[in-house]
Amino acid sequence: MLPVPSTDFEHMFELAPVSLWLEDYSAVRRLFEQWRAAGVVDVVPHLRRHPECVRAYGASIRLLRVNRRTLELFAAPDQATLEASLDQVFRGDMFESAIAEIAQLWDGVPEYANQTVNYALDGRRLDVRIRGRILPGYEGCWSRVLVSLEDVTERVQARLRLERSEKYARGLFEHSPVSLWVEDFSAV
């Protein structure tokens, strides 16, 4: 098998059809060590009692690099703009999903998966499926974590529309002031 030139890997990262983030979680690892030294055993209830710890987790992640698809998805002209606007990207309805992500890492799992909400810089809500992986060789320090984001907004919105439609039809059927019944004439 021929060795793959490093430029090929650069192109694969940059041109991947999914959003890719290369991040440094070494400060997260140190934060976890502090929490453990303070006596935290079960991280989920601890985080619910201390939401500032979730914010500390987020602030501990250092962004190293993103690819083009990330910039397109988040409507950012460049990485510096995206990085300066992360408080707009990660906000509000992320609390519970962040706890799930933290719990997976806390348990020593080198990979995590999660579904959450982010926001593009133009204000659009993005439902995203996140997968993170501590890269091989960095398990001891967590200084290289590859995170992918899949935009599942259309799927989530379609499911919500279907649920609303079903609820409307069920309500119409159950609360109609006249008799309604359904017949199947497909066999006729």
Annotate each PLM feature.
Residues 121-125, 129-145:
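Short loop/turn elements at sensory-signaling interfaces that couple input to output
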Residues 26, 135, 152-153:
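PAS/PAC or PAS-like capping segment
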Residues 2-52, 56, 160-188:
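PAS/LOV and related PAS-like sensory modules
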Residues 70-81:
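PAS/PAS-like sensory domain cap-loop motif
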Residues 80-82, 86-117:
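Terminal output helix/cap of sensory domains in signal transduction proteins
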Residues 21, 64, 96, 101, 112, 114-126, 129-133, ...:
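PAS-family sensory domains
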Residues 139-140, 145-170:
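Sensory coupling linkers of modular signal transduction proteins
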